[in-house]
Curated annotation (Swiss-Prot):
It is found in: Cytoplasm. The keyword Cytoplasm applies. It comes from Koribacter versatilis (strain Ellin345). It catalyses: (S)-4-amino-5-oxopentanoate = 5-aminolevulinate. It is an enzyme of class 5 (isomerase). This is Glutamate-1-semialdehyde 2,1-aminomutase. The lineage of its organism: Bacteria, Pseudomonadati, Acidobacteriota, Terriglobia, Terriglobales. InterPro entries: 4pyrrol_synth_GluAld_NH2Trfase (IPR004639), Aminotrans_3 (IPR005814), Aminotrans_3_PPA_site (IPR049704), PyrdxlP-dep_Trfase (IPR015424), PyrdxlP-dep_Trfase_major (IPR015421), PyrdxlP-dep_Trfase_small (IPR015422). GO terms for biological process: protoporphyrinogen IX biosynthetic process.
Length: 431
């Protein structure tokens, strides 16, 4: 179909005069796919609507938080009820402990938890805590894994920086970047070599248990357990970054899925019900090093703010009470969608592979199975951009970058899947 974008175009032009690039996060500018970004004004269930009235089946879902769909009534009601009592106090509220209890019950690795306002804050704080606990300075991360935009973690970070075609970010001092050891994902030997070379100097290993920021890339068999074994042996802290996967791939996150018990966990997205919130938590002996109990400082004016706590609690309570229905259905719908689009690509002669874990997935425009950053980098990003534009024209909203994961929600229906597959067939025909 032909979409009118007159109003979106006007709004984008106005924003560009006031905001760098007209956006508050680079991927929203559509630089990776071309075309004009629609300006969204409303979401309902599995759909979003732009300023010109165009509707789209949404597989971005605010980059993962909206597992129950847009404007989910119990979450909206919880936010409204909390807002009537006050939007922020800069002091503790009962709902903080309620949400903390819900998370601790869901994830056995978390004995204590601290709420913050973004995933970047969570991973940055977890890194600082690991360094403070161990007295060591080096950290290990993996190529193509994105853990937010703190300086230490913007090294071979996949996702946004990969989309921009740069290895990291200007403004990160070399002296700081040199303390971050970026290793290939799914490669245990590389981790062993790093710990041999930097014996007794590595504070932590931080890993996305299922990568979402070079597209969806699951761990190889026993990879996560190997990381756990190595860090335990070497006295380092294992940080599992579940900002994206927590409560998404299972109610207990990737930890439940893979039987993992890390030292620290970072969370975000779903635990805020669509509002800005994140957290880090883990072993009591480590968490008790945080001020005011210990010497590792972290604070925030809006940390644990009542609106986000209420939204997150409503979200987690619904997921907990309906987990036996929600997660199997999401898995089945996602498998159906991913496989049928793969079939359509094969019939059209388009090279396409896919990875999926639960309701988190990516179609890769390559004939290679993607297991790490090197294989992800073989994707035809230009062809993905053409596909993305054709899908938008057909009313399907996909992540505007090849190296981002897509998601389903409980609001998606079988008809949504049928319509998306039909749109993909038409898109493949014109590539």
């Amino acid at each position: 179909m032909s979409r009118k974008l007159d109003r979106s175009r006007e709004l984008q032009k106005r924003a560009e005069a006031l905001i760098p690039g007209g956006v508050n996060s680079p991927v929203r500018a559509f630089r990776a796919v071309g075309g004009e970004p629609p300006i969204l004004v409303r979401g309902e269930g599995a759909r979003v609507f732009d300023a010109d009235g165009n509707g789209y089946i949404d597989y971005v879902l605010s980059w993962g938080p909206l597992i129950l769909g847009h404007a989910f009534t119990p979450v909206i009601n919880a936010i409204e009820k909390a807002a009537e009592k006050g939007t922020s106090f800069g002091a503790s509220t009962p709902t903080e402990a309620d949400l903390a209890e819900a998370v601790v019950h869901a994830m056995p690795a978390i004995e204590k938890i601290r709420f913050v306002s973004s995933g970047t804050e969570a991973t940055m704080s977890a890194i600082r805590l690991a360094r403070g606990f161990t007295g060591r300075k080096y950290i290990v991360k993996f190529e193509g894994c994105y853990h937010g935009h703190s300086d230490s973690l913007l090294v071979k970070a996949g996702s946004g920086v990969a989309t921009l075609g740069i290895p990291g970010s200007a403004g990160v001092p070399d002296e700081l970047a040199q303390l971050t050891l970026a290793l290939p994902y799914n490669n245990v030997a590389a981790v062993e070599q790093a710990f041999t070379k930097f014996k007794g100097q590595i504070a932590c290993v931080i890993v996305e248990p299922i990568v979402g920021n070079m597209g969806c890339v699951p761990p190889a068999a026993d990879y996560l357990q190997a990381l756990s074994d190595i860090t335990k042996r070497e006295g380092a802290v294992l940080i599992v970054d579940e900002v994206m996967t927590g409560f998404r791939v299972a109610y207990g996150g990737a930890q439940e899925l893979y039987g993992l018990k890390p030292d620290l966990v970072t969370l975000g997205k779903i635990i805020g019900g669509g509002l800005p919130v994140a957290a880090y938590g883990g072993r009591k002996d480590i968490m008790d090093k945080i001020a005011p109990l210990g010497p590792v400082y972290q604070a925030g004016t809006l940390s644990g703010n009542p609106l986000a706590m209420a939204a997150g609690l409503a979200m987690l309570c619904h997921l907990r009470d309906n987990a036996m229905e929600i997660y199997p259905r999401l898995d089945q719908l996602s498998a159906d969608l991913v496989n049928r689009v793969l079939d359509a690509a094969r019939e059209a002669g388009v090279a396409l592979t896919a990875n999926r874990v639960g309701s988190m997935f990516t179609w890769f425009f390559t004939d290679k199975h993607v297991t790490d950053w090197d294989s992800a980098a073989t994707c035809d990003t230009k062809q993905f951009g053409q596909f993305h534009g054709a899908m938008l024209d057909a009313g399907v909203w996909l992540p505007p970058a090849q190296f981002e994961a897509a998601f389903l929600s409980s609001a998606h229906t079988e008809q949504d899947i049928d319509d998306t597959v039909a749109a993909a067939r038409e898109a493949f025909a014109i590539l």
